[in-house]
Amino acid sequence: MTTADISRKRVIPAAVVAVVALIVAVVAMTAGEQRANADSHRYSATDSAAMSMSRPAQPPRGLQPAKLAFHDQMRKLWEDHVTWTRLAIVTFADGSPGFGATAGRLLQNQTDIGDAIKPFYGDAAGNQLTALLHDHITIAVELLQAAKAGDTAALQDASDRWYANANDIADFLAAADPVHWPQATMRAAMKTHLDQTLAEAQDELAGNYAASVADYEEIHHHILEMADLLSNGIMRAFPQDFPN
């Protein structure tokens, strides 16, 4: 065996080692890139999901800006109605000193709702609706007081007046627009609202807190339907006030 042969035998293993090292390096780089891409995809998907959750719900399709704004305004007013009603029920049941302030804010909401119809039906009609809604709240407070005290007679009296007032509110709206707010429809909507709110109050006073929360979920769903019924009626009755 010559010196050249020995040299060639030494070179070949070195070359193989070099090639293997190169292959290992390439594989390692590829694996690293794949992991990086996977992480990037995962974080990107997570960020996208978070951004999607943070975005507000899409507005109803087909509504022009003026209609959409009014639709949202009416929903906000009635969401405030059930939100402050719930807070009033909870603070009353707990004996919280915050009840008075909460009830005051709830009464302000009734004025806001009455004001919302004034551009269409006039100041007198708006003030009348506010007065009816104020009675709706003050009678509800009497009902809560009677229920907490266990005064059956006072509870029945307040309940009778509360449901009669609900019919008065429904009849007022039906008289304002019998086409879009039929009396039977409005009475049924108001009765459902009262039934649900009464269940919420009874559960809260009895300490059935999970049931009270579930009651509120139903109340919230129903009040949005009612708000849409009201806003749709006004937009159809006064199309000139909602240009495309």
Tell me the role of every PLM-derived stretch.
Residues R161-H221, E225:
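An amphipathic alpha-helical core segment
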Residues V26-A45:
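C-terminal region of N-terminal signal peptides and the immediate post-cleavage residues
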Residues D47-R105:
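Immediate post-signal-peptide N-terminus of mature secreted/exported proteins
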Residues T2-V17:
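N-terminal export and membrane-targeting signals
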Residues P13-A31:
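Hydrophobic alpha-helical membrane-insertion segments, chiefly the h-region
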Residues N37-D39, A211-N244:
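A cross-kingdom marker for long, charged
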Residues T85-L173, H222-I223, G233:
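Alpha-helical segments in soluble extracytoplasmic regions
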Residues P60-K67, T91-G100, G122-G126, D151-L155, ...:
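Alpha-helical rod/repeat scaffolding segments in eukaryotic adaptors/tethers
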